[in-house]
Each structure stands twice: as C-alpha cells, then as structure tokens.
C-alpha cells in the first residue's frame, strides 16, 4: 500500500485533472474517448512523481480490467495524460 504522502499527491493530481478535463479541450477529448471505449465511465490513474513505473502499470492493469484508463502525471506544474489500454500496452 502506498504511503499517505503518495496518496495525498495522487489525490491532488486527480483533482487537478478533474478540473482540467472540464476546461481543457484536449483532456476533455481524452476522457470522452476513454469513456466511449470503456462503454461508459473511464478510470483515471494519477501518478505521484516518486512512484515506480512498473508499479503504476501494474495498478493500471488491475483497475482497467481490459478497459482503457487514463494515466495522469505531473511535471514542472504541467499535467500530462495518456490513454492506456491494458490489452495492447
């Protein structure tokens, strides 16, 4: 299980992405695409800067259950979002 600090950082990044998906057309389009492919709602996997990439991908596969998810990272104050499909990546 992740530390409290990592969980807080994930929550902060998820909150920022939630707001950004309402305002930023690129993020909104990514959420729409993921939801369409998943047949409804999509999952967002926020990634804290200190997290290991292998752990993040493992967590995404568990959450995805074969559906696409959005992996969100933050670098230099900017959000970066990427669609991840556990069947093809």
What residue ranges belong to the model's regions?
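Short, hydrophobic/π-rich interface segment
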Residues: 36-68
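An N-terminal amphipathic alpha-helical segment
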Residues: 1-43
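Compositionally biased, intrinsically disordered low-complexity segments
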Residues: 7-9, 16, 48-50, 66, ...
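C-terminal edge-of-domain segments
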Residues: 67-89
